[in-house]
Amino acid sequence: MQPVVILDCFTVEPSGLGVPPYLSTYVRNAWSALRRARPEADVRYVTIDDVRWCLAGGKPTVDPPQSDPFTYSATVNRDAAIQLLRDAEIVVVIAGDAVPSVHLHAVNGSFEEIARALACARGRRYLLGPLSAYALTTPAEYAGLFDAVHTHTVTSGDLLFGSHRPADYGQMQRERDSFTGLVEQMPWRPIAELELYRGCTRRKFCDFCNEPAKSPLVAFREVEDVVAEAAQLYAAGVRNFRLGQQTCFFSYRNRDEDAIRALLGGIRERCPELEVLHIDNADPLAVAAPVGLRIAKLVADYCTEGNCAPMGIESFDAAVIERNTLTCTPEILTRAVEHVNEAGAARGPGGLPMLLPGLNLIYGLPGETHGTHVANLRGLAGILDAGLLCHRTNVRLARAFPGTPLAALGELTPLPSAEYFLSWKADIDFTWDQPMKERVYPTGLRVPGLHSYFIGQGGTWWRRLGSYSIQIVERDAAVPLGTTGALVVTGHAPRLIYGERVASAS
C-alpha cells in the first residue's frame, strides 16, 4: 500500500498559528480526512524542514551546537522524506502566510521550496491553507502544481475535487479521527490550536483582515465538540492547548459567560493533567464591555499562568482608524487593558501573571503619515504611565491578503513606513517594549518550569510553552536542548530578557 503524506510548510494567520510546536487545525483536519478516505493507508506527517534536510544531503545550515532554524522542526520521518514524497499516492500540502511572520526557530516554506518538494511527488497533490487564496487569485503562477485546492477544510468526500467553502462543524466532528498516530510522528511537545468559531462577530470589518473574506458568516462550534476534540488530543498525549484560530475568544457564542465557563471547565475536567491552557486573540471592543471583565476573570481562574489576550488597536491615529474601519479607539483599548489587568495581573505559582493583554500595531495602512508614529508612541506612553501591564507587543507591516478591502485598493502610493518602519519599530522597542518587560519580568524574578529550546550566537534561549510565552536568554551558553530548570532574570534589552540558571537542571 502506498503511503499518503501531509507536507506541513507551516501557516500564519491573524486568527491562528501553525508553526511547530503549534499543532494547527489544518494538519489535524488533513490527518482525519486522509485516515477516513484511505483507512488502510500509512499516513505520514512530514515538514518542510524534513525536505530541506534531505535536499541538503543530511547536513544542517549552521555549525553545531547552534540550532538550525531551517531544519529545527524535523520529524521522525526526516531521513525518508523525499522517498515518502516519491512513493505517496496523495500529498496534502499545508502552507500560507496571511500575515508577515518571523520565528527564531522556524522558517515557513516558500513557494520555491514547495515547488521543489512537489517535483519529487508522483501522486496526486492537494493544497490546504492560506496559500490557497493566492493560488486561486493568480492561477497561472500555480499552474500544474496542484491537482485541487482546498481553501478552508478538507474532507474524505471532497479530497479529490477541491473545496472553496468550509465543511460544517457537524461533518468535521463526524470525520475526526484519533490523533495518536499523528502526535507520535512529532519529536517535540505540541501545543494544539483549538478553533472555537469561524468569521468575525463585528458589524464592521477591518480592511486588512482576511477572516471576513475567508468566512463571511459566523459559525460557532458547540462547547461539547471543542471539549471532545481536546479530550481526543489529550488521549493522544497532548498536554498543551491554546484556544485560538478565531478572531476573539471573548466573543465565543456572542460573549456567553455560561458557555465560556462550560468550555474552560469541560477542558479542565476532561484533561486533568494538562500543562498549558491559554487563549489567543481578543477584540478590545468585547474586552472593554462589562461582560469582558467577567470573562477575563473566568480565563484567569481556569487557564494556566503566563496567558496572553492579544488585542489589535492597530493604530492610535484617528485618521488611520477611520480610513480602515478599525472601530477600536485608544479610549476603548485603555478600558480593555484595564479589565485584563484587573482580572489577571496577579502572579501564579510559577511567578508569571495569570493573564495579561498583548497589543498589535500595524504600519502601512492607508491614511498613514509621520504623525501616525507619533500618535502610536503617545498612546503606548499613556498605558505605560498608567502603571498597566502588557505581556507582549507585535509591530508589523500590513499585507494585502487576496479578497480583503486592502487588496482591492491595488498599488498604493508608498507610505512613510515603507522607508521608516525599522526605525519606528526600534523606537517602540526602546521606549515601550523594554520598559514594559522590566515591569512585568523584573530583575531578580525567578521563573521555574523553563526548557532550553534554541542555541544561537548570543546564547541559549529558554521558554515555557504557551501563547507568546516568556523567553529568557542565557548568554554565552550552549545548553543541550530540552534541558529543564529555573532561571532568574538578570537584565533586559529591546525584545529580550536575560537570565541565569539558579537551580539544578535535568
Q: What function would you assign to each model-found segment?
A:
Residues 2-7, 232-371:
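Conserved SAM/AdoMet-binding glycine-rich loop
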Residues 13-27:
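Glycine- and acidic-residue-enriched helix-capping/strand-helix junction motifs
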Residues 40-57:
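A short beta-strand-loop structural module common to alpha/beta enzyme folds
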Residues 50, 70-173, 489:
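Glycine-rich beta-alpha loop elements in corrinoid/cobalamin-binding modules
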Residues 136-144, 290-297, 365-385:
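Catalytic cores of alpha/beta
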Residues 186-225:
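Canonical Radical SAM [4Fe-4S] cluster-binding loop centered on the CxxxCxxC motif
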Residues 254-258, 381-451:
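Radical SAM enzyme [4Fe-4S]-AdoMet core and its adjacent flexible, acidic
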Residues 417-506:
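Terminal RNA-binding accessory module
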